[in-house]
Amino acid sequence: MKPLHYTASALALGLALMGNAQAVTTIPFWHSMEGELGKEVDSLAQRFNAENPDYKIVPTYKGNYEQNLSAGIAVFRTGNAPAILQVYEVGTATMMASKAIKPVYDVFKEAGIQFDESQFVPTVSGYYSDSKTGHLLSQPFNSSTSVLYYNKDAFKKAGLDPEQPPKTWQDLADYSAKLKASGIKCGYASGWQGWIQLENFSAWNGLPFASKNNGFDGTDAVLEFNKPEQVKHIAMLEEMNKKGDFSYVGRKDESTEKFYNGDCAMTTASSGSLANIREYAKFNYGVGMMPYDADAKDAPQNAIIGGASLWVMQGKDKETYTGVAKFLDFLAKPENAAEWHQKTGYLPITKAAYDLTREQGFYEKNPGADTATRQMLNKPPLPFTKGLRLGNMPQIRVIVDEELESVWTGKKTPQQALDTAVERGNQLLRRFEKSTKS
């Protein structure tokens, strides 16, 4: 028989280990990052968990942005919401009005962790800040903007300069026709058509998308993207479509795959698509700025962000919120934010991450990697080009998709389609306005 004191010591050690295991606070994190992006999310969580053994971030892919938002709100009503929910930028007004969230500045304050809100790039943080207090409601994470990807090898074959992507939409139409004539299957395709062809087109060309400074100044905003400039742009795409120089391939990021598999020579897509393009493209490619309308006065202006931020959900205990604050602080550290930016193509969300990336020589070694950032900082944003804050915006995007599809199929003129989209969208805005006052 073993001596009693050894047995007692072993028992005490075992109980201590069990206690430590039980003390680990699990923090569910629902997101919409798949493929290479999902792998990087997992990597960040694993590193945080290794450095903070009292907490365990559990990332779970819950489908695309719409699916994740719907799932998060639905389970909140049952009391089973995740601690952290990734929500795309147009879900901001919905989250603000949901009463399901705990503002991140409160989370940090209650956890006793210093939180410097000024560290975030203003054009990014402004999208997620309270209009009255200026405090962040959610933490920027995978912020992006739309950029132009182009196949340099296809450019050479078509007799185009592979180092000179089209600067204007008029140039793009001309380039696409030449690419098609050279034998490529698809000259140009676009991802996220509402976000790129109307939301970002408007901001990049110095045009409002909606009144009340795109909704930042009140829920009584009305949509304004059926003006002559936007109608002219959609009409140009319609004409390209008729000629076969513009291919409509889907409502989301389907054009990215069409690009990296070599079908399409050019696409406008999220800067966050760079990770998959870098992984799968078997040809030389370039990253250019979004084209602007050659007839637009003072264009280009500034791009607005897409992507998503991290929202903290209500109803959790103090220890969970402390772990959440530690994780969000971890994500914002320069070395982690810079790595996320460099590996994914999403914007550097903090000034320090941008400076570190530049100091490391990343932009020199990877031409075009700073394109999205330069677009965001091209000019100081106007009151109506800093972003959108419109209720029911996810549903409005669906309406825009439906109406643009009616143009590509020849069922409506650009003016008819945009007028109808504005009319239908305004009905949703009034419904949202009413709900916030009830």
UniProtKB/Swiss-Prot annotation:
Q: Which SUPFAM superfamilies match?
A: Periplasmic binding protein-like II
What is one process in the GO biological process aspect for this record? transmembrane transport
Does Transport appear among the keywords? yes
**One Pfam family in the UniProt entry:** SBP_bac_8
Question: Where is the protein localized?
Answer: Periplasm
Subunit and interaction comment:
The complex is composed of two ATP-binding proteins (UgpC), two transmembrane proteins (UgpA and UgpE) and a solute-binding protein (UgpB).
**Protein name per UniProt:** sn-glycerol-3-phosphate-binding periplasmic protein UgpB
Species of origin: Shigella flexneri
